């Protein structure tokens, strides 16, 4: 007998053993097929969230599956140094002590960051172990460790030498609070209610005539370089080429024609501010306007405008109105609007809904800013030598496109290729510099004249310069730069290692769609460029995990679920404190508390890692989003318990018994048709689950396994086995015990990639009993294969007959309201001999007996059913009055529920305005109630006959 199922106990025991025994490490036998997979490195600052649990379940499932298939497997884990996120965490800790990074200086500050990383930076990798990730922790990397730092420097220098890295002045996303450029992924567009200001721009040669320009950002007016109109807009064609007076400045700017302007939107006149708007930058570039920067790096108005051409060359500047100098951009907006009003330039102000770009870390409004940055050229062809391969001579962007177009890298689902190509066809040069202290410092040095020397170290730079006293570039690299190198930086490049031969390209990358461009495309670029190989053969794109109503999980909504809380459980008080602490908007705390109490009135019970993993696997379809329902996790906790209890039953009936195993045992003979049926179903399940794993359809694998284990094995075969073990001859009992063990052991191996802990625990007991302990751990045992024998169709046909008979009897009981504790005799009238079937019916359907007769006995009240040509009668005395009263009460209860639901669905506007999933649930509930009502009415009608 097994003890009570306790996930926590078995999880800690087995994971420690797996890791200490080295089971996660590849054996580096290059004659074996390889399977490798890269972990998208989570931020070192991070903690496990549902998205991690989702994709790590898929990655670990694949790794365990291919390990069991005999592959040399490598799942390489690591963490990302997360430049901005990590620097903010440490700066906030210092701020609590009234210390800034500038007080410490760069060197001391970086020491503090490394100290923090060593103490707190491993949280997420420990949590990965809790989920059961069988990653090779001996190969764990950090994107700023010594090996990765050398690789980053080598790549940067080579790209620079090939003319693919340059420094230039371009428009970037600028976070004025952080004081650095940020990537598009670090910018959140927030819908806000703002204003649209309509302003008069008078003609220089006739100030009484003016064009009306509308803008949501009047503070950027100081940097206007032109006003654009559509070339086909007849209202303004006569003005193209004329000069306008720029309000508040006295400067004149030209009217230009550009198809970017939608003539039917607004007034049809658009102010062009190339230094402070990305779209305007492109318009200005087409017309070679000036780039006029009017803000400093803190987003305050400059005293003197900084002017450049599109080559980044400085042009003569000019003074800005003195009264605005030094004002924050929003204070300047307020003052300028007042001045526009006073001077007669403001026509009207209209309410306007707009999308405001904000930094995801600071919440500050992102400013498009003209700054000097380092860039990787996406479309330029490399200078100098390259490895001789199919990608040689192509630009980085073209290499990435060719890798996908040729099929060397495929997307799953395939429709993501369109998204990938859309991004690649509109690609811009990549801004790789950040104005931070934490990160890979750019390997470039400057002399006093501003000449730049890119080198692997300072000595090499000084050799290039022919002098000492150089100053190193202070900027660091974008975090995505080092992340883009992990397919080969983790395998020993630039050396030719066995790891590179065995594990590049990896088999699959499992990731979310939001980083297809930021990470996936850049890994393809860098890996093809430096190794001539693609980084991975397939990209499996999974959806985003949302809450049960389809809403994005966020702390402010109060709908975040911590995977570790699902594994361990958490009380309501602790859960409330966890969810309401550290909110970006503290005023949302009552709303968060209310939502939490509604969803988890008693907190979250412990589910265990296996239940969490099976839940995630069941959601791993090819959709764009995953609506996580806690009730499903509860259901799969019950599934794990079902497996545990089923194993207990098998052990109780096989321990110290002759099961047909052992060195001298002969193959059992005399299998019953249920034995043959479950073996056939096992073979079918092996084929289906293997296909599902091979095609990354973990949802289908989970569905198939659940159905086989719960329905076929537990609900049907175990119940039939009880009959066989009680009534069968010695040979039949031996064959049944043999089959019980054989099928259970194989099922545990089938389940192992998804639920590794419980399967390891049970397999260690079950496998030795059926000569299947071929390895020290189930994770090293072979994945089940079909036995090669044909499915016995006769057994399948016999099982169908039996299931139909049992179903018919159960329906008879249900339709006539026979209570579960009431036993009755069954009479069967059939031309066929049903003896092989009838022996199973009493135990399966709570009968006193099941007897085949030549003709059914006379009984006007006894219910009769027809099944496969046989007539079935339950001989039972029914108290018609009592049963009629019971059914009438049930009908009344159902009618009230139907009336309530019909009223809800017929309420005006409900089906149009309510969330679609709620409407569908209500309709499904209505159909179920109607079905129940029909059955009750049918029973009442029979009682009246």
Regions from the language model: what does each represent?
Residues 24, 165, 346, 409, ...:
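Conserved hydrophobic residue
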Residues 198, 388, 422-481, 485, ...:
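Feature 926 captures the class I aminoacyl-tRNA synthetase adenylation module centered on the KMSKS loop
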């Amino acid at each position: 007998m097994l003890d009570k199922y306790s996930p926590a106990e078995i999880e800690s025991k087995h994971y420690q053993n797996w890791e200490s025994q080295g089971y996660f490490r590849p054996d580096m036998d290059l004659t074996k097929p390889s399977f490798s997979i890269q972990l998208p490195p989570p931020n070192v600052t991070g903690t496990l969230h549902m998205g991690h649990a989702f994709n790590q379940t898929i990655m670990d499932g694949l790794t365990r599956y291919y390990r069991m298939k005999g592959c040399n497997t490598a799942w390489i884990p690591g963490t990302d140094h997360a430049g901005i996120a990590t620097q903010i965490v440490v700066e906030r800790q210092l701020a609590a002590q009234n210390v800034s990074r500038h007080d410490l200086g760069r060197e001391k500050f970086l020491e503090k960051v490394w100290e923090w990383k060593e103490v707190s930076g491993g949280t997420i990798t420990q949590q990965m172990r809790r989920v059961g990730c069988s990653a090779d922790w001996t190969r764990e990397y950090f994107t700023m460790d010594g090996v990765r730092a050398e690789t980053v420097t080598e790549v940067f220098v080579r790209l620079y030498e090939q003319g693919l890295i340059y420094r230039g002045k371009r428009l970037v996303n600028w976070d004025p609070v952080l004081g650095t450029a940020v990537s598009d992924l670090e910018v959140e567009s927030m819908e806000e209610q703002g204003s649209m200001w309509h302003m008069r721009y008078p003609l220089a040669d006739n100030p009484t005539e003016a064009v009306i320009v509308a803008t949501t950002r009047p503070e950027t007016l100081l940097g206007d370089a032109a006003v654009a109109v559509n070339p086909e807009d007849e209202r303004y064609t006569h003005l193209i080429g004329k000069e306008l007076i720029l309000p508040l400045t006295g400067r004149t700017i030209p009217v230009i024609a550009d198809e970017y302007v939608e003539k039917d939107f607004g007034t049809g006149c658009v102010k062009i501010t190339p230094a402070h708007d990305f779209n305007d930058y492109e318009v200005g570039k087409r017309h070679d306007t000036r780039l006029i920067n009017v803000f400093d790096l803190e987003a305050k108005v400059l005293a003197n405008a900084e002017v450049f051409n599109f080559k980044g060359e400085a042009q003569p500047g000019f003074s800005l109105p003195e009264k605005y100098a030094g004002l924050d951009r929003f204070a300047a907006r307020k003052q300028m609007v007042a001045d526009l009003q006073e001077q007669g330039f403001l026509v009207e102000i209209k309410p306007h809904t707009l999308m405001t770009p904000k930094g995801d870390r600071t919440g500050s409004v992102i400013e498009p800013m003209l700054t000097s940055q380092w860039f990787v050229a996406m479309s330029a062809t490399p200078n100098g030598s390259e490895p001789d391969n199919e990608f040689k001579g192509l630009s980085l962007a073209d290499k990435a496109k060719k890798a996908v177009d040729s099929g060397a890298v495929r997307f799953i689902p395939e429709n993501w290729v369109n998204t990938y190509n859309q991004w690649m066809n509109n690609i811009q040069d990549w801004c790789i510099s950040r104005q931070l202290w934490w990160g890979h410092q750019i390997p470039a040095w400057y002399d006093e004249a501003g000449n730049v020397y890119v080198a692997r170290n300072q000595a090499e730079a000084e050799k290039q310069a022919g002098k000492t006293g150089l100053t190193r570039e202070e900027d660091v690299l974008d975090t995505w730069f080092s992340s883009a190198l992990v397919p080969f930086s983790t395998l020993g490049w630039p050396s030719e290692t066995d790891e590179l031969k065995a594990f590049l390209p990896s088999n699959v990358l499992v990731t979310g769609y939001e980083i297809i461009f930021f990470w996936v495309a850049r890994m393809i670029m860098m890996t093809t460029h430096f190794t001539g190989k693609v980084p991975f053969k397939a990209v499996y794109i999974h959806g985003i995990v949302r809450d049960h109503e389809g809403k994005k999980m966020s702390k402010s909504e109060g709908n975040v679920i911590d995977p570790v809380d699902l594994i361990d459980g958490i009380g309501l008080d602790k859960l409330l404190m966890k969810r309401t602490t550290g909110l970006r908007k503290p005023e949302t705390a009552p709303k968060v508390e209310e939502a939490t109490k509604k969803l988890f009135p008693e907190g979250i019970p412990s589910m265990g890692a296996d239940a969490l993993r099976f839940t995630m696997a069941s959601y791993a379809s090819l959709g764009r989003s995953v609506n996580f329902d806690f009730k499903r996790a509860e259901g799969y906790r019950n599934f794990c318990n079902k497996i545990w209890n089923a194993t207990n039953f098998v052990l109780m009936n096989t321990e110290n018994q002759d099961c047909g195993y052992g060195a001298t045992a002969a193959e059992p003979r005399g299998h019953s048709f249920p034995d043959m049926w479950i073996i056939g179903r096992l073979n079918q399940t092996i084929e289906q689950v293997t296909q599902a794993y091979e095609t990354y359809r973990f949802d289908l694998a989970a569905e198939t396994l659940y159905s086989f284990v719960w329905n076929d094995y537990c609900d049907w075969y175990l119940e039939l086995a009880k009959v066989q073990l009680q009534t069968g001859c010695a040979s039949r009992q031996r064959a049944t015990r043999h089959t019980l063990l054989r099928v259970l052991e194989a099922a545990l191996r089938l389940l192992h990639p998804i639920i590794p802990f419980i399967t390891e625990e049970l397999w260690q007991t079950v496998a030795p009993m059926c000569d299947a302990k071929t390895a020290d751990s189930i994770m090293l045992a072979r994945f089940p294969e079909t036995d090669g024998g044909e499915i016995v169709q006769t057994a399948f046909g016999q099982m169908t007959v039996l299931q139909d008979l049992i179903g018919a009897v159960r329906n008879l009981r249900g339709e006539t309201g026979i209570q579960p504790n009431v036993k009755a005799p069954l009479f069967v009238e059939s031309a066929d001999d049903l003896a092989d079937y009838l022996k199973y019916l009493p135990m399966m359907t709570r009968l006193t007996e099941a007897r085949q007769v030549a003709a059914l006995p006379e009984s006007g009240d006894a219910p009769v059913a027809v099944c496969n040509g046989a007539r079935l009668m339950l001989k039972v005395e029914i108290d018609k009055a009592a049963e009629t009263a019971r059914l009438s009460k049930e009908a009344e209860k159902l009618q009230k529920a139907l009336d309530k639901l019909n009223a809800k669905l017929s309420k005006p506007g409900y089906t149009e305005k309510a969330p679609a999933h709620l409407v569908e649930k209500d309709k499904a509930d209505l159909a179920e109630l109607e079905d129940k009502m029909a059955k009750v009415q049918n029973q009442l009608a029979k009682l009246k006959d």
